[in-house]
Structure formats: structure tokens, C-alpha cells
A protein has these predicted regions:
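C-type cytochrome heme-c attachment and multiheme electron-transfer modules
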Residues: 1-194
Length: 194
């Protein structure tokens, strides 16, 4: 396969990027949990170490029909879906998630009870994830009680083309062996979520 210019001229990104959105839970401001790649620590803190990351290479079809290997960031999203009255799968509305998770602007007591691992009556981002059947069943039961049929978690991964942070000269990839060897960039792994 031919390679896009960006493949050699964007060998690494020197900033964090979204890795995943977790809409199976809500933060207190009704947002999903977000995870970033390319940073050690909280991306909102100036003390976190930015490490950057190497984008994954995927096939891209240009408008002229040419297929090229090009750099992408992969973003994984997790979310609740349910079956509507016609049997069609639909995403659970934010309003319904808010109803399941909150009472009077705070986490509902049954949510705190099942998610609060350290028993301090608050939920940290590390606790606020569905990592047990008890947590999943609690949220599922609350969504079912709202009239949603067969609520369950799904996920999808979307590729986002990288066309910025172009380098030139000695910072671009100038060695064919970077891709043409047993540890090729083409077959490198990229973590999809935490």
C-alpha cells in the first residue's frame, strides 16, 4: 500500500488526545468519564507529564479513490442502549441516565452504595466505572424501571484522521525500516481504553 504524506511527516504527536468516552456512568456535571492517551496523570492538571503517542496507521481512501496508509487516533465510546417498541436499538437518552444516577443534584443513594468502594460517601473517578456485575445490574435495573427494554452496554471505536503537527526534515521518518521490519509501525498496538 502507498503511504500518505502524514504517515512519515506525523510520526508522533506531542500532546494528549482523547482515548475514550465512558457514557455508562455520569460525572456530577452529567459528563462521561474521559480518558486520554499521551499523558501521565490528569490532563487538566499542569503537573501531569505529557508523553505524546504514536498514531496508529490505517487505510484511508482519498476522494480520488487512492488508498493510502495514514495516521489516526482511535477513540472508543461506551454507552447504554435499549430496544424500543419496534425492536430497534436506541441509545439511552442523557435525561434517562441523569434520572438513574442522580437525586436532587447528587448521586442517588443506591448508586453511591454500589459504586463507593472506599465507603467515604463520595464517588471518585476511579470508583465511577462499571467494573462489576453489581454496578452494571444496579444501573440496568434503574433504566429498566424507567421503562427501557433490555438496557445493555455497547461500545464502538471510531478512527479520527490526524492531519496536524506535521514535521519535516530530520523529524520526519526517513528510514524505510521503521515500517518494513518485524516491529513495524503498521502492526503496532494502540490501547483503546482503560
Amino acid at each position: 500500500a502507498a503511504v500518505a504524506c502524514e504517515t512519515c511527516h506525523i510520526p508522533q504527536l506531542y500532546a494528549p488526545a482523547i482515548q475514550s468516552y465512558d457514557w455508562t456512568v455520569l460525572t456530577l456535571n452529567s459528563q462521561p468519564l474521559k480518558a486520554c492517551r499521551g499523558i501521565n496523570g490528569d490532563p487538566t492538571k499542569t503537573t501531569s507529564l505529557v508523553t505524546g503517542y504514536k498514531p496508529v496507521l490505517l487505510n484511508r481512501t482519498n476522494i480520488d479513490g487512492n488508498k493510502l496508509l495514514a495516521p489516526y487516533n482511535l477513540i472508543t465510546s461506551y454507552y447504554w442502549v435499549y430496544d424500543d417498541a419496534n425492536g430497534n436499538k436506541r441509545p439511552v437518552r442523557l435525561f434517562d441516565l441523569q434520572t438513574a444516577f442522580f437525586e436532587n443534584g447528587k448521586y442517588a443513594a443506591d448508586i453511591v452504595s454500589v459504586f463507593d468502594a472506599n465507603h467515604d460517601d463520595t464517588l471518585s473517578n476511579t470508583e465511577l466505572k462499571i467494573d462489576s456485575s453489581a454496578k452494571e445490574e444496579t444501573v440496568k435495573a434503574k433504566l429498566t424501571s424507567l421503562g427501557l427494554n433490555n438496557p445493555h452496554i455497547e461500545g464502538s471505536t471510531q478512527p479520527y484522521s490526524i492531519n496536524h503537527n506535521v514535521t519535516r526534515g530530520e523529524n520526519a521518518i526517513n528510514d524505510c525500516q521503521v515500517c518494513h521490519n518485524e516491529n513495524s509501525r503498521i502492526s503496532q498496538s494502540l490501547k483503546l481504553s482503560e
